Amino acid sequence: MPYEIKKVFASLPQVERGVSKILGGDPKGDNFLYTNGKCVILRNIDNPAVADIYTEHAHQVVVAKYAPSGFYIASGDISGKLRIWDTTQKEHILKYEYQPFAGKIKDIAWTEDSKRIAVVGEGREKFGAVFLWDTGSSVGEITGHNKVINSVDIKQNRPYRLATGSDDNCAAFFEGPPFKFKFTIGDHSRFVNCVRFSPDGNRFATASADGQIFIYDGKTGEKVCALGGSKAHDGGIYAISWSPDSTHLLSASGDKTSKIWDVNVNSVVSTFPMGSNVLDQQLGCLWQKDHLLSISLSGYINYLDKNNPSKPLRVIKGHSKSIQCLTVHKNGGKSYIYSGSHDGHINYWDSETGENDSFSGKGHTNQVSRMTVDESGQLVSCSMDDTVRYTNLTLRDYSGQGVVKLDVQPKCVAVGPGGYTVVVCIGQIVLLKDQKKCFSIDNPGYEPEVVAVHPGGDTVAVGGSDGNVRVYSILGATLKDEGKLLEAKGPVTDLAYSHDGAFLAVCDASKVVTVFSVADGYSENNVFYGHHAKIVCLAWSPDNEHFASGGMDMMVYVWTLSDPETKVKIQDAHRLHHVSSLAWLDEHTLVTTSHDASVKEWTITY
């Protein structure tokens, strides 16, 4: 096999303010699940750097839950499609697909024998359904609510009971199978966000936007108590999760705290303050074995520490929005990956362990369009907030210095030796030296899109939307047009010089990569065909003999310079999402990013 996936650094959960986010637990205790966009992400709970991504939904996925057997996962999307798929094989073969109702699926529950499934949400004609997993035959009706149902759970032993919570401020109680509506529970005064039965089935809890948690008898549905008296939290409660022994309950709230409750004596055991920023609101939680997890509005996943509630054991960071660009850099003998997303967030990853964090301080306020590292070890990034930033990679701190404000929005940035930076903006090319503007070409007569600086430092290539590449010379503090026009096969989308400066590779919207030989006066060396859609990005391998290209067709090709027929094709590198950026860690390791907000490392063998 010429390529192999080496590592997957998965995206964070996709979160929305005021909406609870479900973390699905694994009955075997190894993994946990959540969703982002059209992906379901499975991560190892002990080592979250180990991840797997399921991408077979055509629409945004909202919730995914393991069957109690652990062999299947059911996932539901905004169109009302429920897919049940295999967890034991890498291919995740589809077992069954159902459409219980037309509209967003918000929660899923299985019976303990993994044979029946309840699905609730925002259907047009009904808000829930309960059916056999293998035939889809109905095993009851979910009625009793007049608004969208947010949550459902089923008692995990016989006699079965089912509970739901809805935006009509009520919970409902059902007996079955076949499941029949018994009564409505109207104790809450706001939306009911979450209902959960304890693992032993003796009790169930409801949590609401009114800040209250009520405990009920699991068999009869009678009220037992209100946790914490009149208020369990100062804000709305979005999620609850029982401890494996059914004695304690974990709750997550918009008041930016999570709490552990001793249900038997009705008291708070610990409170976890998660911060003071609005992004620290807690939208989801999971108690699995010894792990207590919560999700913040920032998308970060917190591992809570019972022994030290004020500080999480670890926080999983990353991206929850699409990644636009990446670059790599060696620092202190380690290779790091830097990725920038369309919300202005820049993250750095240890390429071996997947340990990652974001830069401290206030950075870009809009999409990061392009990043590169200059000779002094600074990350140079340009963003739709009309700035170019220079960030020290040893400190990884956005300082007030190192920000260059531009007149128009930058699209691409490239650096050369001697402190030079060239920025391509809308209708403008800007030359910076030592972080200061020294020259600009204001009306170049074409629309510049991308830029590359020759490793020698004296030549700049600018690709335009007119399908041409123009060559400029850096002379002191000016840029001089050399009058050279290199023709690509379509609007130029990216270009790069090989590390030895011998070749310039240009990719375009017409699905072609053209390589020019620099020493021969930029004569055309070779043309590379293979992509089925617009090529977005390219990167040279350190060996100067291979280069990779990624496109809207979700494919990555690794090309051999001397022979266009010798190529490695990575199909569906990021399934359902186009490849947004590429970089090489070494001659055999390629890093790709995509709008699925994940980073992948591939081992390439020739």
Curated annotation (Swiss-Prot):
Residues modified to N6-acetyllysine: K28, K81, K95, K115, K480
Disulfide bonds: none
WD repeats: 4-45, 48-87, 93-135, 138-176, 180-218, 224-263, 270-306, 311-351, 358-408, 432-474, 480-518, 523-561, 566-604
Keywords: Acetylation, Actin-binding, Cell junction, Cell projection, Cytoplasm, Cytoskeleton, Phosphoprotein, Repeat, WD repeat
Keyword hit for Repeat: yes
Cellular component per GO, a single term: cell projection
Domain of life: Eukaryota
Name of a matching Pfam family: WD40
Subcellular compartments: Cytoplasm, Cytoskeleton; Cell projection, Podosome
Keyword Phosphoprotein: yes
Family statement drawn from the similarity comment of this UniProt entry: Belongs to the WD repeat AIP1 family.
Name of the protein described by the UniProt record: WD repeat-containing protein 1
Organism: Rattus norvegicus
Lineage: Eukaryota, Metazoa, Chordata, Craniata, Vertebrata
Gene field: Wdr1
